[in-house]
Amino acid sequence: MADQLTEEQIAEFKEAFSLFDKDGDGTITTKELGTVMRSLGQNPTEAELADMINEVDADGNGTIDFPEFLTMMARKMKDTDSEEEILEAFKVFDKDGNGFISAAELRHIMTNLGEKLTDEEVDEMIREADIDGDGQINYEEFVKMMMSK
């Protein structure tokens, strides 16, 4: 399944993997997974974290290595995000709940994920997704952006 990914996708997933793999040892532990999820405003229990790891932990060693992570991402891409998942993601970005993602909200989330973006990069992301040109991303624009990935 992971062999259906483009080089660009694999590079993107490698970057995402490094954000999770805080100590850089090549594996994601439940602790590291929890840290990232909490930085995104989620509050998973230890049991939920263990379940998430076990779901993709092919060799059963209790951690996720990069090949296992790729398989998980490929699987997720295949059952392309349900409307519900996209709405949840939108709510994570839309901190003040006003129905729009502002440049400041986008910058805040990306920084929490460990992605240090310049103001230009954040503005560029907004511009790419901002179909009606109002300087922020509404839900419809967010859905289009998520579906086009």
Swiss-Prot record:
Residues annotated for Ca(2+) 4 binding in this entry:
D130, D132, D134, Q136, E141
Q: Does the keyword Acetylation apply?
A: yes
- TM region(s), chain numbering: none
What are the residue boundaries of the EF-hand domain, all occurrences included? 8-43, 44-79, 81-116, 117-149
Detail which positions bind Ca(2+) 3.
Answer: D94, D96, N98, E105
Q: Which residues carry this modification: N6,N6,N6-trimethyllysine?
A: K116
A molecular-function term among this protein's GO annotations: calcium ion binding
Function description: Calmodulin mediates the control of a large number of enzymes, ion channels and other proteins by Ca(2+). Among the enzymes to be stimulated by the calmodulin-Ca(2+) complex are a number of protein kinases and phosphatases.
Database matches in Pfam families = EF-hand_7
Instruction: Print the miscellaneous field.
Output: This protein has four functional calcium-binding sites.
Q: Where does Ca(2+) 1 bind?
A: D21, D23, D25, T27, E32
Which of the residues bear the PTM N-acetylalanine? Answer: A2
UniProt protein name: Calmodulin
The record's listing under InterPro entries reads: CALM/Myosin/TropC-like, EF-hand-dom_pair, EF_Hand_1_Ca_BS, EF_hand_dom
Q: What cellular component GO annotations does this protein have? A: myosin II complex
Species of origin: Saccharina japonica (Sweet kelp)
The family this protein is said to belong to: Belongs to the calmodulin family.
Q: What is the lineage of its organism?
A: Eukaryota, Sar, Stramenopiles, Ochrophyta, PX clade
**Assigned keywords, A-Z:** Acetylation, Calcium, Metal-binding, Methylation, Repeat
Q: Which residues bind Ca(2+) 2?
A: D57, D59, N61, T63, E68
Reading the lineage from the top rank, the first entry is Eukaryota
